[in-house]
């Protein structure tokens, strides 16, 4: 088995990638700003990064921030990986980074190009939005009495555990270049997703679609962020877990945790 470094290994995706790789018998190092012994800020680089990649066969690069710094972080990581003789760099990107003119997407696309031109063996996987991100957007919109959502926009949310499994498999294999995109099992309109969220959460809100302006909105409305098939595009992969299944499992987990907490408090009181 190989030694694999996972950047952003304590995050939503990186944590699951780490668990999957360890379950498959790989030696895994977790790099994040606060995880010892490889606590490294990739935007700064430095000797800590060199120690983290020393003796590593493969790097799975999950660390990312919409607040900026991804390109600088990737340059530092690639430089250290080349110096250490890393064999394979796996990068997780987003479906639509070349179709939707959003600042964060432009940064992800720039990192893709850095990876491709790194001189390392490389693999790039693009995935659609995680269920968790769509949920956060809907929860934010539901803070108002009326849920205001961009008109005419659909989404294709995917289960993060399925993305993690795909990344782990790619990390264990030979460099493959740009691989087929991974999207969720269903393309759904935002109002449809919102109504599913309201139904499972037991909340009541009026859902209203609002036309917006700008290139990013036009890109999302045109479906540039969805997995494309046919018309000369490579066939994309699809996850299996639907948004309703994600919401239901999350609600059931919260219910079990609540019951366990109440039982614990009752036991202590008795």
Which positions does each model-derived feature cover?
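N-terminal Rossmann NAD(P)H-binding glycine-rich loop of SDR-like oxidoreductase domains
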Residues: 2-26
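Rossmann-fold NAD(P)-dependent oxidoreductase module
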Residues: 16-20, 80, 114, 166, ...
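NAD(P)H-binding glycine-rich loop region in Rossmannoid oxidoreductase-like domains
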Residues: 26-84, 94-100
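Glycine-/Pro-rich loop/turn segments that contact NAD(P) or position catalytic residues
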Residues: 65-143, 155
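Glycine/proline-rich active-site loop of Rossmann-fold NAD(P)-dependent oxidoreductases
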Residues: 132-138, 170-180, 203-205
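Non-catalytic, hydrophobic alpha-helical segments
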Residues: 160-167, 182, 190-193, 246
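A hydrophobic C-terminal alpha-helical subdomain
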Residues: 198-256, 265-270
